[in-house]
């Protein structure tokens, strides 16, 4: 039988990989945003988004933009596709993190 530690370790690995996928997709979205939506790029502090001095309120602005699906009105299909991918990966990563934390407390 598979031990609880093995299950928890596997969940942690899967969660970690999906978090890396999410951050990579977010980085590519911000790169594409520079050309496709310069105003939003400036509003979310595109240059300083992943730095230690990044403005959290500007990062929350991007979260709300993607959460409310405002990108559906954009003309660039690549940009809307990246936004959709980031949104899906965020939901997946959040769910996996919740399941992993739940499993850590149960096991």
Swiss-Prot record:
First-listed, main subcellular location of the protein, grouped into a coarse class: membrane
Nucleus keyword on record: no
Keyword S-adenosyl-L-methionine: no
One Gene Ontology cellular component: plasma membrane
Coiled-coil blocks: none
Keyword tags: Cell inner membrane, Cell membrane, Membrane, Transmembrane, Transmembrane helix
InterPro entries from the UniProt entry: Universal_stress_protein_B
Membrane topology: Multi-pass membrane protein
Localization in the cell: Cell inner membrane
Transmembrane segments: 6-26, 86-106
Similarity comment text for this entry: Belongs to the universal stress protein B family.
Name of the featured protein: Universal stress protein B homolog
């Amino acid at each position: 039988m598979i031990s609880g530690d093995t299950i928890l370790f596997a969940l942690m690995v899967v969660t970690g990989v999906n978090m890396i996928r999410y951050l990579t997709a977010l980085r590519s979205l911000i790169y594409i945003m520079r050309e496709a939506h310069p105003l939003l790029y400036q509003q979310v502090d595109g240059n300083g988004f992943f730095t230690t001095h990044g403005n959290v309120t500007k990062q929350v602005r991007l979260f709300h933009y993607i959460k409310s699906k405002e990108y559906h009105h954009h003309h660039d299909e690549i940009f809307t596709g990246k936004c959709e991918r980031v949104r899906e990966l965020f939901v997946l990563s959040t769910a996996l993190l919740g399941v992993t934390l739940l499993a850590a407390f149960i096991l």
